[in-house]
UniProtKB/Swiss-Prot annotation:
Catalytic activity: (E)-4-coumarate + ATP + CoA = (E)-4-coumaroyl-CoA + AMP + diphosphate
Organism taxonomic ancestry: Eukaryota, Viridiplantae, Streptophyta, Embryophyta, Tracheophyta
Gene giving rise to this polypeptide: 4CL2
Residue segments, region SBD2: 360-427
Coiled coil: none
Binding sites annotated in the UniProt record for ATP: 216-220, 265, 337-339, 359-360, 364, 448, 463, 554
Region described as SBD1: 290-359
Domain notes: Both substrate-binding domains (SBD1 and SBD2) are involved in the substrate recognition, and are sufficient to confer the substrate specificity.
Keywords noted in UniProt: ATP-binding, Ligase, Nucleotide-binding, Phenylpropanoid metabolism
Protein's organism: Narcissus pseudonarcissus (Daffodil)
Protein name, as recorded: 4-coumarate-CoA ligase 2
Ligase found in the keyword field: yes
Chain's role: Produces CoA thioesters of a variety of hydroxy- and methoxy-substituted cinnamic acids, which are used to synthesize several phenylpropanoid-derived compounds, including anthocyanins, flavonoids, isoflavonoids, coumarins, lignin, suberin and wall-bound phenolics.
Length: 569
């Protein structure tokens, strides 16, 4: 069995650049507007989450599809039963790895928490991944158990590489529940008869032990296992929701959080599920996104806090179905995972005037939250449109000049770097990638271009690798995308570089027209040309039915680049 204990990433750091000046400028370090707090990051994650909520009588987890709710005590009990099942039936021990190949469901919650109780590690994957992608993550992570819905069991390889693998299947409905599991699989229903008092003693699980291993987005390279420890995850949740004036104020026994974003993505896992568990708020779980189903869920359960990504903001802002439902209970809309344009913010605020709309910013490797709007705090402060808020408490942020490596001051764009107890331990078995991401001083280099303004607010300009170079000028795609979405006949858009013999690269746009629009390439080009400097003008427009995006809402630019390359060949 490959275990994290046996294969901790060794964090090697590159030697300092001896060509740099010996006396670089004094670094400008940015911190939160909110004061630091005492973090309870010495506790194992599962103990920390239930520390103040175990006796709460209010709902903890609600299944939108079945209507069943679980109290905090029931959630804890079923998680202990799952831990017992994983140990006695599947042989999982401290340091072992469990893979979750699940759509959002209560069993995801019980499996994640149960693994933590054993001192084991979970790695989650998208059930829509191909069998080859699933096998690649399975082998890379060293998982010995996969928990999945019955419909996806056939995707799991049973060749010699994974012959000892145990596949546990979750039933999607009552009919499946009473049927035998697929051949060679174990039914998750066995959890119900497991002895919750037979959980092996997990004493010795320390803050630096791994608890989760998400695989980082493959949008800029090959996916890599990100080792997040108990300390990483308790720190990140604490930075957001703990203290007398939490950055994200969730009300115990009152708030209902919408969990429609996939739990296999760190944004939903951290900022929805774990924050809800810690604060005593209810989490209503939707198996997958469907517009009318989401609106019905918000209305039925009185959702008060909606964590979304820009594509959902776009749907909430422009889809006429929204007008059919009562959205009056929504008091906060938190957008993350990808940049949100000012124009889209304004449209949504017009539709949900009672709600506070704001952004958070993060990345998997950062644990994940780096900054969050203080407009969500118990004692809120105003935030500018387009801002990602201020850096979270108990962390530091600096902006680095990519050319010189020197720290930059306010209002100067550069690479965002973050340091704090929440960042990853490293990439699994990849010391070279780890040392390229976390420097000798503990700064995690995000690869994102941004700046901090005079009010300590963080603004993201773009990804370093996504910047378009037009005759040496830098063109940020996110800026042009935000402008395009401001056109009433454009439903969605993405901008990427296209190679050009003269300019090197030119910006080209993929546009999804609104229904029954008369949009043409010239109309789009002219619309942008009126708003930008010459080198930011759109050179080509490709009309498309949908912009390809990851489950977290990030534009899959490499897919669009492949389309452009096919047009040229």
């Amino acid at each position: 069995m490959i275990t994290i204990a046996e294969s901790h990433p060794q964090i090697h750091h590159s030697p300092p650049d001896t060509t740099a000046p010996s006396t670089p400028p004094t670094a400008t370090i940015f911190r939160s507007r909110l004061p630091d707090i005492v973090l309870s990051n010495h506790l194992p994650l599962h103990e920390y989450l239930f520390e103040n909520t175990l006796t709460s009588p209010s709902p903890c987890i609600i299944s939108a599809s079945t209507g069943r709710s679980y109290s905090f005590a029931e959630t804890h009990l079923l998680s202990r039963k799952t831990a017992s099942f994983l140990s006695s039936r599947c042989g999982v021990r401290r340091g072992g790895v469990v893979m979750l190949l699940l759509h959002n469901c209560p069993e995801f919650v019980f499996s994640f928490l149960g693994s933590s109780m054993l001192g084991a590690v979970t790695t989650a994957a998208n059930p829509f991944c191909t069998p080859q992608e699933i096998k690649k993550q399975l082998l890379a992570s060293g998982a010995t158990v996969i928990i999945t819905q019955s419909a996806y069991a056939s995707k799991i390889s049973r060749d010699d590489d994974v012959e000892d693998l145990i596949v546990v299947t979750v039933s999607d409905n009552e009919l499946e529940r009473h049927a035998a599991p697929p051949e060679g699989c174990v039914s998750f229903s066995e959890v119900e008869s497991a002895d919750e008092d037979a959980v092996p003693d997990a004493v010795g699980v320390g803050p630096e032990d791994a608890v989760a291993m998400p695989f980082s987005s493959g949008t800029t390279g090959l996916p890599k296992g990100v080792v997040l420890t108990h300390k990483s995850m308790t720190s990140s949740v604490g930075q957001i929701v703990d203290g007398e004036n939490p950055n994200l104020h969730l009300r115990k026994g009152e708030d209902v959080l919408l969990c429609v974003l996939p739990l296999f993505h760190i944004f939903s896992l951290n900022s929805v599920l774990l924050c809800g568990l810690r604060t005593g708020a209810a989490v209503v779980i939707m198996a997958r996104f469907e517009m009318e189903g989401m609106l019905e869920t918000i209305q039925r359960w009185g959702v008060s806090v909606a964590a979304v990504v820009p594509p959902l903001v776009l749907a909430l802002a422009k889809n006429p179905l929204v007008e059919k439902y009562d959205m009056g209970t929504v008091r906060m809309v938190l957008s993350g995972a990808a940049p949100l344009g000012k124009e889209l913010e304004a449209v949504l605020k017009g539709r949900l005037p009672q709600a506070v709309l704001g952004q958070g910013y993060g990345m998997t490797e950062a644990g994940p939250v780096i900054s969050m709007s203080p407009g969500f705090a118990k004692q809120p402060t105003p935030v500018k449109s387009g801002s990602c808020g201020t850096v979270v408490r108990n962390a530091e942020l600096k902006v680095m000049d990519p050319e010189t490596g020197f720290s930059l001051g306010r209002n100067q764009p550069g690479e965002i770097c973050v340091r704090g107890p929440q960042i990853m331990k490293g990439y699994l078995n990849d010391p070279e990638a780890t040392s390229a991401t976390i420097d000798v001083e503990g700064w995690l280099h995000t690869g994102d271009v941004g700046y901090v303004d005079d009010d300590d607010e963080v603004f993201i300009v773009d990804r370093v690798k996504e910047l378009i170079k037009f005759k040496g000028f830098q063109v940020p795609p996110a800026e042009l995308e935000a402008l395009l979405l401001g056109h009433p006949s454009i439903a969605d858009a993405a901008v990427i570089p296209q190679n050009d013999e003269v300019a090197g690269e030119v910006p080209v746009a993929f546009v999804v027209p609104s229904k029954s629009s008369d949009l043409t390439e010239e109309i789009v080009k002219e619309f942008i040309s009126k708003q930008v400097v010459f080198y930011k003008r759109i050179h080509r427009v490709y009309f498309i039915h949908a912009i390809p995006k990851s489950p977290s809402g990030k534009i899959l630019r490499k897919d669009l680049r492949a389309k452009v390359a096919s047009f040229s060949s």
